[in-house]
Design a protein with these regions (language model features):
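Pocket-flanking alpha-helical
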Residues: 45, 63-110, 205, 225-230
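Short, well-ordered beta-strand elements
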Residues: 28-40, 58-64, 165-169, 291
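A conserved helix-loop-strand patch within extracytoplasmic ligand-binding domains
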Residues: 106-168
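Short, polar/charged alpha-helical segment
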Residues: 40-58, 184
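An extracytoplasmic/periplasmic, membrane-proximal ligand-sensing/linker region
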Residues: 40, 175-191, 196-213, 224-225, ...
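Ligand-binding pocket segment of bilobal, Venus flytrap-like solute-binding proteins
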Residues: 72-87, 167-246
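C-terminal lobe and pocket-closing loops
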Residues: 228-290, 294
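A bilobed periplasmic-binding-protein/Venus flytrap-type ligand-binding module shared by bacterial periplasmic
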Residues: 126-139, 268-283, 306-307
Length: 336
């Protein structure tokens, strides 16, 4: 009888605990997030998800969903609650996304297609492209300040293939329309752009030169794992500027050396984005405030990219490690 009473009491306690846990799970604040289809975006989203779940009590359901117009439409329809790290220049290339409200070169968007169906929140990740030299080259040549000094040192960048000209390890794919040689010519930089065909080939050349401690000039963009592994300095190309006239035959905007492609690239102020109706709900007020405060940065992402892409570490483990080591950063994103 005593054992029977104990068994019944124990069973009741187990059932009670199960019901409490079930109720807690059922009542948990839930959101659905699209998992980015590139590593940088996945890192940014996992940082957000980890904080939403561990600090703000949300349960996040993750769905793999390719970036692009379909994702914007899924968020606008309420099928997905939020996604992370959209790049405006990528969106700009899509006909459906052509509008004047992009976060591009400092211009902040607050709505999708002008109808307010998607809200956007800047991430802190800023896409930047430039030509870069190793810091050891700058340290060895303290008079080198920016792109305008490249010709003074072109002999150090010359190769048997370029003769008296310096060499630029250029934008690797012609389809990206970087116009490296046109830019060099318009700016009077006596270098030859070398297009290697793939990002991997360009990076391999740069890594080999870095390990030999040779000077090299490299086209690259941030954030990128390369900057988490190697110390590089941008040459500060002239600030991005465009003009209205467009020369189709040359595929570049023809308005002299004051504008593209003689200037550098526009900055991409990337953003997280979500469904306004979802984040207008009282139970999601803290999540909405969190996204307005979240400010991840290029340097942190670059270091994490090295761990994931070069060391093949688990992405969630790398994010947890970053979160544990950087409470002074992410705690400022938590609503009061």
């Amino acid at each position: 009888m005593k054992n029977s009473l104990f068994a019944k009491t124990f069973a009741a306690l187990i059932l009670s605990s199960f019901l409490v846990l079930s109720a807690g799970t059922a009542n948990a604040k839930r959101l659905t997030a699209a998992v980015a289809d590139w590593t940088g975006g996945e890192l940014t989203c996992q940082v957000a998800v980890a904080i939403l779940e561990e600090e703000l009590g949300y349960r996040i359901d993750r769905i793999e969903f390719a970036s692009g117009t379909g994702l914007w439409e899924a968020i606008a329809a309420g099928d997905i609650d939020f996604a992370c790290e959209s790049w405006p220049s990528y969106a700009e290339a899509d006909d459906v996304m052509l509008n004047t409200n992009l976060i591009y070169d400092g211009e902040v968007v607050k709505e999708y297609s002008g109808d307010g169906s998607v809200d956007a929140y800047t991430t802190g990740i800023i896409g930047m492209s430039d030509y870069y030299v190793p810091k050891y080259f700058v340290d060895a040549n303290p008079d080198f300040k920016d792109w305008s000094d490249l010709n003074k040192y072109k002999d150090q960048f010359a190769t048997p293939e370029t003769g008296s000209k310096g060499r630029l390890i250029g934008c690797p794919v012609a389809g990206w329309n970087c116009h490296d040689q046109k830019r060099l010519d318009l700016l009077g930089i006596d270098f030859q752009a070398d297009e290697l065909g793939t990002e991997a080939a360009a990076i391999a050349e740069a890594v080999a030169a870095y390990e030999r401690k040779e000077p090299f000039l490299l086209y690259l963009w941030e954030p990128h794992w390369f900057f988490g592994a190697y110390d590089m300095v941008g040459v500060k190309l002239p600030a991005h500027k465009t003009c209205d006239s467009f020369t189709e035959a040359n595929n570049w905007k023809d308005c002299g050396t004051a504008a593209w492609p003689a200037t550098g690239w526009a900055k991409d102020y990337t953003f997280n984005y979500g469904n306004p109706a979802t984040f207008a709900k009282p139970e999601n007020a803290k999540a909405a405030e969190f996204f307005t405060k979240m400010k991840f940065d290029n340097a942190d992402q670059a270091v994490m990219l090295v761990e994931v892409k070069q060391k093949n570490r688990d992405l969630k483990e790398v994010v947890k490690e970053w979160k544990d080591a950087n409470p002074d950063k992410w705690k400022n994103w938590i609503p009061k």
